[in-house]
């Protein structure tokens, strides 16, 4: 009760501060700044999460942000602190520190580092005239990066065997490499394709390979949820029970997100580049092809990531009538919520 009272008094102090920002909403510790019920609100929320500027936050600035949030929590906030400063401090902390362990996440594996560190891999995946070795290398590197990001941002409240992550990683690598190599071989053997058509088709091979690997990774790493169910909560955040049906919904939403995510990243650049390569500028200056290709991939990646992860709210809602009878009987709420996962 003491913590609740001090937090409430801190919230009141922040809201009534004379220099409080009129644009920023009242600060809520641990809550998203933007409403999660609308796609636009989720989009704005995830733009904050993937903001690459947080990669350049100094150790001193991080300590100041953490201390400011601690002061807010304990009701010892200094006068004049604005809601904007509190939201900024929370953004910095959430971008750098793991929420369960409070340890710093290695920079390339932070969500804010996903685009800057992942774009070179996307460029490699979409390079024309891939050899067998380069196809295997880029697919392996992409799945390795994804696995590290997933592990670094995992739910660490409960111990999870390393074998689960290894199983998901190996499954994703094997499926991605197998499909990419298989499709490349089929395209090479397709006699009906002209050399230009064959090159164009080969550029789209990474998408089905990556999309199928993403689904494989989700299923292998989270199949236990289908057997045991996931927690569902009422409107007040109280645990209602564990539901296998909610687990199926969560996995389906996550799988759809991971199929949609690589679509613009791996489909748009080949289309755009096939048109740009015909321009007089790039035909006269072929050395510009790689830099232009990289910029196109960066733009596609930067647009696709927040759009894809904004499709579904992190805490999804479902009617109790769609769940197991014991769940419906355990609560008077018409709907419950569940965490769909990363």
From Swiss-Prot:
One matching Pfam family: SFXNs
Location of the protein in the cell: Mitochondrion inner membrane
Keywords, in A-Z order: Amino-acid transport, Membrane, Mitochondrion, Mitochondrion inner membrane, Transmembrane, Transmembrane helix, Transport
Family: Belongs to the sideroflexin family.
Lineage of origin: Eukaryota, Metazoa, Chordata, Craniata, Vertebrata
GO BP field: amino acid transport; positive regulation of cold-induced thermogenesis
Protein name (database record): Sideroflexin-5
Induction of expression: In brown adipose tissue, expression is induced by cold.
Membrane topology of this protein: Multi-pass membrane protein
Catalytic activity of the protein: citrate(in) = citrate(out)
Membrane-traversing stretches: 105-125, 165-185, 256-276, 289-309
Expression sites (tissue/organ): Expressed in liver and brain. Expressed in brown adipose tissue.
Biased composition (Low complexity): 1-26
InterPro entries to which the protein is assigned, alphabetical: Mtc
Chief place where the protein resides: mitochondrion
Region described as Disordered: 1-30
GO cellular component: mitochondrial inner membrane; mitochondrion
């Amino acid at each position: 009760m003491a913590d609740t009272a001090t937090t409430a008094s801190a919230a009141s102090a922040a809201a009534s501060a004379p220099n409080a920002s009129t644009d920023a909403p009242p600060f809520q510790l641990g809550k998203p700044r933007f409403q999660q019920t609308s796609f636009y609100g989720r989009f704005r929320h995830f733009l904050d999460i993937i903001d690459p500027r947080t990669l350049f936050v100094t150790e001193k600035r991080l300590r100041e942000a953490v201390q400011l949030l601690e002061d807010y929590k304990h009701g010892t906030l200094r006068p004049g602190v604005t809601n904007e400063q509190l939201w900024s401090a929370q953004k910095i902390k959430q971008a750098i520190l793991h929420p369960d362990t409070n340890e710093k996440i290695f920079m390339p594996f932070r969500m804010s580092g996903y685009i800057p560190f992942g774009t070179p891999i996307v460029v490699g995946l979409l390079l024309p005239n891939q050899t067998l070795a380069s196809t295997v290398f880029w697919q392996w590197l992409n799945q390795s990066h994804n696995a590290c990001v997933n592990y670094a941002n995992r739910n660490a409240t409960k111990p999870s065997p390393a074998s689960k992550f290894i199983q998901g990683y190996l499954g994703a690598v094997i499926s991605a490499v197998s499909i990419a190599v298989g499709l490349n071989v089929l395209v090479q053997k397709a006699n009906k394709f002209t050399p230009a058509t064959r090159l164009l088709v080969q550029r789209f091979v990474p998408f089905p390979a990556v999309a199928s690997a993403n689904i494989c990774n989700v299923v292998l790493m989270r199949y236990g949820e289908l057997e045991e169910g996931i927690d569902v909560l009422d409107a007040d955040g109280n645990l209602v029970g564990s539901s296998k049906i909610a687990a199926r919904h969560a996995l389906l939403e996550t799988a759809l997100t991971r199929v949609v995510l690589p679509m613009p990243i791996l489909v748009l650049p080949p289309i755009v580049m096939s048109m740009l390569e015909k321009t007089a500028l790039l035909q006269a200056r072929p050395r510009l092809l790689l830099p232009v290709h990289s910029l196109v991939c960066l733009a596609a990646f930067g647009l696709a990531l927040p759009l894809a992860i904004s499709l579904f709210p992190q805490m999804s809602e479902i009617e109790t009538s769609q769940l197991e009878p014991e769940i419906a009987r355990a609560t008077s709420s018409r709907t419950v919520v569940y965490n769909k996962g990363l």
